[in-house]
Structures are given as C-alpha cells and as structure tokens.
Amino acid sequence: MRVVKKKLLRIFTSEDESFEGKPFYKYLLERAKERGLEGATVFRAIAGYGKTKEIRKHKLFQLRSSLPVVVEIIDEEEKIKRFLEEIKGKHNGLITLEDVEVIYL
C-alpha cells in the first residue's frame, strides 16, 4: 500500500450552467482529461442551494433541470493550480481546494 498527498478540487455548478455551448461540467471534465489530470468525477445532487438561497430540486414534469452538480478533480498541487488558472473567469460559483491522501493498494 502506498499513500500519496494530493489536492482535491471541487467545483460547484448546476446542470444548466454552460460554457462554449456545452454544459459547464462537461467542459471541465474534458479540459481535465486533455490536461492529463489524474482523475475527475461529476456528481449530480438530489437538491441544494447556493448564494441565491433558492432551493433547487427535481420537479416532476419539469422540462429543464437546474440541479446542483459537483465536479471533483484530484492531482498534484501544481497541476491543480495550473488548471485553476485556465478556468479563471469562466465560473462564478463556489470552488474549494483541500488536502487529501490518495491510497494506492
């Protein structure tokens, strides 16, 4: 077993946020892969709220969804910081960065 210190980047967005004609979470996932970042996962929330305090949740028969989405990316600090520089100005939502230990079995 090997334990390595990495950074976990979390970007909070929503299903309806877009950039360059595609959902913002897809843009982030594609950029992370292109830049060779170690791993990225997209989570769709059941419900949530942000700075507007408007609770967003799934509604039956709703044509457009605006559920919260979280993109998590893990890699070394320098690669994460470069990625953050690249997406600067493209998102005005919450972004968090924390230390994690990745365990390779």
Swiss-Prot record:
A Pfam family per the record: DUF190
Superkingdom of source: Bacteria
Record-annotated disulphide pairs: none
Family matches, as InterPro entries: N-reg_PII-like_a/b, N-reg_PII/ATP_PRibTrfase_C, UPF0166
Similarity annotation: Belongs to the UPF0166 family.
PANTHER family per record: UPF0166 PROTEIN TM_0021
Name of the protein: UPF0166 protein aq_450
Species assigned in the record: Aquifex aeolicus (strain VF5)
